[in-house]
Regions:
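Transmembrane alpha-helical segments and their boundary/interface "anchor" motifs
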Residues: 24, 60-64, 76-111, 131, ...
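Alpha-helical transmembrane segments in multi-pass integral membrane proteins
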Residues: 2-16, 30-55, 76-80, 84, ...
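Membrane-proximal cytoplasmic C-terminal regulatory module of class A 7TM GPCRs
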Residues: 346-379
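Small-polar-interrupted transmembrane alpha-helices in polytopic inner-membrane proteins
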Residues: 25-32, 175-191, 231-236
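Hydrophobic alpha-helical transmembrane segments of polytopic
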Residues: 17-24, 28, 56, 63, ...
Length: 424
């Protein structure tokens, strides 16, 4: 089977994936500023925003789009890399910007604007705020000091699953089996009320992560029917979740009754857009501005919510709703730019190197010379396609109970430089 793209150099970037990530972040920004009930507006958004807000409400689905991108990028990052380097790259990428953004939000909600958490129904204590600096506050049921932070707990759990897969050894067959069985296993343990496994397996958003991983296999190895059918299966699982969750969530958080058709289309778009920018000639597009777009995505996601709402709260009566929204967007973009240049570019590399120095001796002793990642090439004679019956037992589908969702209260963050690997 011919590869999707010609062999590329390691330095060739997936520029359009960077752009898609920024668009996903901007869709979430638009949802928060122009559609969601918020302390910025002291309730529902003004009527002046309604013509736009009834559409930007679906920007909330930028979060599952982030998760599909996560599945793609994290598998690409982990393949061929050992566990210490993978963990160090994640720590260096996520934490510097997060610590600064979390510290800012702590000062804002505890000192400058306590009406913010009061409006959102959160009681945030000093100890809760400090636990937020770890990024694992969700594991302890502690409120996030910034509403956008909830997605990072999902990301961390996905990283853990990737590490477990790396320890077993990443091969094409194992990734196919993992992506097939993960959402089904999650649905089974959810139906049995197994709290620990349900938290680990994330039944609600697992199909989005798994779908992104499968799209990376298609990008890496080329088109084949079996993998495409598995992508379709993940999309169906994701649609089942979306139709059971987003109508009620959007009706509660916005003044408008959502359209089921729009939610279904948004769910399909999460997979379709990632496929479009990675499996077509668009994947070959690259430019400096695309790199900048990717670099700003994570810091923008981190800082926009509380900061933007605070700006809207201060300016809405003075310059009107649209003026306040425009200023809030500009301020959020400026803050994201500062966070990237002053924190990420100066600290991320140092933290990554320090983490790697700490992890490598322990990993070397535990590994005893055994590589953490299995060889990439398939065995001779192994077909490029995969039989669904080999990885998807019929009884699991029949008895999975998929659809009985108990969803966590609602919305990622990755390397700004996804690259096209050479010699797929």
């Amino acid at each position: 089977m011919a590869p999707v793209l010609p062999a590329a150099t390691p330095d060739r970037r997936l520029g359009m994936l960077d752009v898609l990530r920024l668009l996903a972040a901007l869709s979430v920004v638009a949802f928060h500023f122009t559609a969601r009930h918020s302390p910025g507006w002291d309730g529902p958004v003004p009527d002046a925003l309604a013509p736009v807000g009834q559409w930007t409400a679906y920007g909330r689905m930028g979060v599952p789009l982030f998760f599909v991108i996560s599945g793609f990028v994290l598998l690409m990052t982990a393949w061929g890399r050992d566990v210490p380097r993978f963990v160090a790259s994640r720590v260096g990428r996520l934490y510097p910007a997060y610590w600064v953004a979390a510290a800012f939000s702590i000062l804002l909600v505890l000192v400058a604007w306590p009406a913010n958490p009061a409006f959102l129904g959160r009681e945030i204590t000093t100890s809760d705020a400090l636990l937020n600096l770890t990024m694992v506050q969700g594991a302890f049921g502690v409120p996030d000091v910034d509403g956008s932070f909830w997605t990072l707990w999902y990301e961390l759990r996905f990283y853990l699953l990737i590490v477990l897969l790396m320890l077993v050894g990443i091969t094409r067959r194992r990734v196919l089996a993992f992506c097939t069985l993960w959402p089904i296993a999650g649905a089974i343990v959810q139906g049995q009320e197994s709290r620990l496994l349900s938290v680990l397996l994330m039944p609600d958003y697992a199909p989005f992560f798994a779908g992104g991983m499968l799209l990376y296999l298609l990008h890496r190895d080329g088109h084949d029917l079996g993998t495409w059918l598995l992508v379709g299966l993940q999309a169906l699982f994701a649609l089942d979740f979306s139709m059971g969750y987003y109508p009620a969530a959007l009706a509660e958080e916005t003044p408008w009754a959502p359209s089921a058709a729009a939610i279904a289309l948004g769910t399909a778009a999460c997979f379709g857009l990632v496929a479009l920018v990675t499996l077509t000639p668009l994947a070959g597009r690259s430019a400096r501005w695309m790199t900048v777009a990717g670099a700003l995505t994570y810091p923008l996601y981190l800082v926009h919510e509380n900061l933007g709402w605070f700006v809207i709260h201060l300016l809405r009566e003075r310059i009107g709703p649209w003026g306040a929204v425009l200023v809030a967007v500009v301020v959020a973009l400026l803050a994201a730019t500062a966070l990237h240049h002053l924190v990420e570019r100066r600290v991320s590399g140092r933290l990554r190197a320090a983490t790697l120095r700490m992890l490598q001796p322990a990993a070397g002793a535990a590994r005893g010379g055994t590589p953490a990642v299995a060889p990439v090439p398939r065995p001779a004679g192994e077909p490029a396609t995969v039989s669904l019956t080999a990885v998807l037992p019929e009884t699991l589908v029949r008895h999975s109970g998929y659809g009985r969702h108990r969803v966590a209260d609602p919305p990622g963050a990755h390397d700004a430089g996804p690259r096209i690997p050479a010699g797929r």
